[in-house]
Amino acid sequence: MYKEKLRESFKVYDEIVLKCFCGIFIGAIVAICEVVFGKGLEWILNFREHMGCVMLVGLPFAGLAIVFLFDHWGRISRKGMGLVFEVDQGKSDWIPLRMAPFMVVSTWITHFFGGSAGREGVAMQIGATVSHYFGKYFCFKNSGVIFMVAGMAAGFAGLFGTPITAIFFALEVLVAGTLKYRAMSCAIPASFTAAYVSSLFGLHKSTFKIGSVSDLDVELSIKLLVLGILFGLIGGLFAFSLKHTKAFVANKIKNPYKRIFMMGILVAILLFVFGKCRYSGVGENLIVGSFTSEKIYSYDWILKFVLTILTLSAGFQGGEVTPLFAIGSSLGVIIAPVFGLNPLFVAALGYCSVFGAATNTFLAPIAIGMEVFGYQYFPFFFVVCAIAYIVNQNESIYALQRQVRE
C-alpha cells in the first residue's frame, strides 16, 4: 500500500517536471514568434506614423484583402480567440497551425493602413496555436488545454514583457471566476522564458513612474471606491458596446466584403477628421502622453473607445487590450483633478482597472499595475481593480468567456 502511494507520488512529480520542461520549450518557441510579430508591428507603426494619414486611403481596400485572405485560405482561423475558447470548452479539438500567420498578417495589414486596434489578442493566439500543436504529442491528462494556456501566457509575456500578468491572465481569462490551476506548472516557466527570450531581441515591457502617493486613509479609500466604479463601468461598457456593435453591423451588412469596405471608409474618414490619425494604431501615443508632459485632451479616451470598436466591428484584426490601456490612462488624467489626486496616479489606476473590467479578470490587472508602475502600489490597484471587477456586470470582450461566480 505504502509503495503504491509512493509510486503514484513519483508519477505526479514526474509529470510536473515534464510540464515545466515543456513550458520552457513552449516559452522559447512562442517568444521567437512574438519577436517576429512585435518587431514587424513596430516597423509598421513607425512607417505609418512617418507617412501620416495618407495610408488611410487604402484602409477599405486593405479590409477587402483581409476578408479575401480568410475566405480562401483562413477558413476556421477567422474565429481567432473564439476558437481558443471553443477548444477549452470542448466544442472544438483543433486549432489550425495556419491561424498564427494569418492573424499576424491581417493585424499587420490593419495597422499598416491606420486602423485602431491592439495586438494582445494576436499575441495570445500565436501562443495558443503554437503550443496546442505541440500538446498533441504528449499523453498526460488535458495536455492540449494545458499547453494552450501555457502558450497564451507565453504569448502575452513575450510581447508585453510582463510574465506575472501573463500567467494570471492566461489562467483566469477562459473561465471568469476561477483559475486553470492544472496549467500552472507549464504556464509559469513558459511565461518567464518567453519574457526573457523576447527581451534578448529587444522586446521589453513599458514602465512608468507615478511618484509618491498618500497613505490609504478613509478619504482616499472613498475616492478609490468611486474610481473603481467609474473605471469598471467604462470597461464593461466597452465590452458591451463591442459585442453589440459587431452583432448590429453583421446583421445590417451581411456580406463581409461590403461590410468591411463600407465600414473601412467610415473608420478612415473618422480617423482623419478626429485628430488626424491620432487614434490610429494601438494607442501607445495616448499611454505615453498620459505619463509624460504631452497633452491629453478630454475627448481622447472616448474617441479611442469608439474608433477601436468600429475598427474591430468592421472585421479588421488586432487585439483590444492596448487600446484599453490607452482609454483607461487618458481618462484617468482627465478626471484626476475632480478627485484632487495626482493625474499620473489616477492614469495608472485607469490603465489597469479598465483592462480588468473589459476582460472580466481580477488578478491580471492588479499584476500589470504592479509590473508596469511598481509593487509598492499594490493596495491601491487591489481596491480599484476589485471594485471594477465587481461592477462590470460580467461583460467581457471575449464573447465565449464562461463565468463562474458564487
Report residues per predicted region:
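Alpha-helical transmembrane segments and immediately membrane-proximal extracytoplasmic
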Residues: M1-E406
